[in-house]
């Protein structure tokens, strides 16, 4: 699932352009939660929509407020670093990867 602070229509547009819309079983945008991150609502809603316990999910994030939301939801959080967040201390993350490419490489190995 994708649970994002962006609007669901924008997420679907991006996925459609990448021919990846059918790969995602659930898309939750900012309109699907009463409160935005750092509150856990959107992540808890995603787990509920998938029919699985939050602890059986994981969150990919690049922001501290997303990490805090995942922690509050009881969902392990993996941080993907980028130029904007490299100096942030993500000490409460389950794992931190220097890039999306490094995360993908770890999945493939």
List PLM regions with ranges.
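Conserved phosphate-coupling serine/threonine residues in phosphotransfer and NTP-handling enzymes
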Residues: 4-6
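Asp-based, Mg2+/Mn2+-dependent phosphohydrolase catalytic module
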Residues: 8, 12-109
């Amino acid at each position: 699932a994708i649970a994002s602070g962006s609007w669901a229509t924008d997420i679907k547009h991006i996925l459609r352009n990448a021919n990846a819309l059918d790969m995602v079983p659930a898309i939750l945008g900012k309109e699907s939660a009463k409160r935005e991150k750092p509150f856990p609502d959107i992540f808890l809603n995603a787990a509920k929509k998938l029919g699985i316990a939050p602890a059986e999910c994981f969150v990919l994030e690049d922001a501290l407020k997303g990490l805090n939301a995942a922690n509050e939801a009881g969902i392990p959080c993996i941080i993907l670093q980028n130029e904007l967040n490299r100096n942030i201390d993500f000490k409460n993350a389950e794992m931190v990867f220097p890039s999306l490419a490094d995360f993908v490489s770890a999945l493939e190995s």
